[in-house]
C-alpha cells in the first residue's frame, strides 16, 4: 500500500493578496484576515548589516573573467519562505530575509550586482542546468539526490521539521519516526526535500501495519497554511527555521513540533560551475569579519550558523 500524493496549485487573486501576510507568518502561508493584520504589524527588521560590506579583491579575483566583466550575477530566487526570503511589503516590492541579506553580502564581497529574479521553488534547480540563472537561492537543502545534478556552496544549517494547527489533536509530540504520520494528511512544498523524503519513505506505514499517510503538495505557500487552518491537512512539513518563525506569529495559530532531519543549506549551481570557489570564499569572508553572525542575529537564526562554508558536503545522516 502506498501513499497518495496530490499536487495542488493555489493562484487565485485571494491567495496572492495574502502573500504579504505569509511573509510574516513564516514558512507556511496564511489565508485569514488575522494574518493580513499581523503582517501589517510585523515589518522586517530595520538594521542593515550588509551596508558596510565592501569588495574584497582577492576573493573577487576567483570569479570567472566573463562574470567580472559583466559585473552581474543572475540569481533565481524563491521568495516567500520567511525568515529566509519574503515580501514584507507585498509582491512587487523589495524582498527581505536571511537569504536575501547573505546573497547581497556575497555579491558585495565579489564586487558584482545581484540581479534577482523571483521564481517558483521547483523551477530553479532545473533552470540552472539550462543557463537561465548563475545561482539559485531558496533554502535548498543539500541532499544526496540533488548532489547528482547540482553543486552547492553552504551558508547555513537548517533542515526538516513539522508543525500542526494550535490546539489540534492529530499529532501532539515531536516526529522522530514517519510512522507517527500514518493515517494523516501532510502538506508540503512542491519540488522540496520534504516531498522527496515523504515519497521515499512511503512504505513505512504498510510495514507497520498502519494506514498510509497522504501527501498534498502545494506550489504556493499561501495554500499550505490555509489548508491547515481549514482542516484539509493535519500537519505541515517544511523548514525548521520557517516553521519555528511561523509558530511565533500569533495569527498563524500553529505549533512547531521540532526538528526531524538537519540539512546543510546552500547556494545552488549547475554541476561543474566555475562560481563555487568564489562563493565559498565570499561566505567565509563574511563569517570571518562578523557580517554573517550579524545577519543571522537580525533574522533570529543564529542557532543555524555554520563555522565555515563547504562545497558539496555529504547529506547529514
Predicted regions, residues:
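A ligand-binding cleft/hinge motif common to bilobed small-molecule-binding domains
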Residues: 123, 140-147, 199-200, 227-261
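Acidic, polar ligand-binding/catalytic clefts
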Residues: 113-178
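Extended ligand-binding regions for polar small-molecule ligands
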Residues: 28, 42-57, 100, 108-109, ...
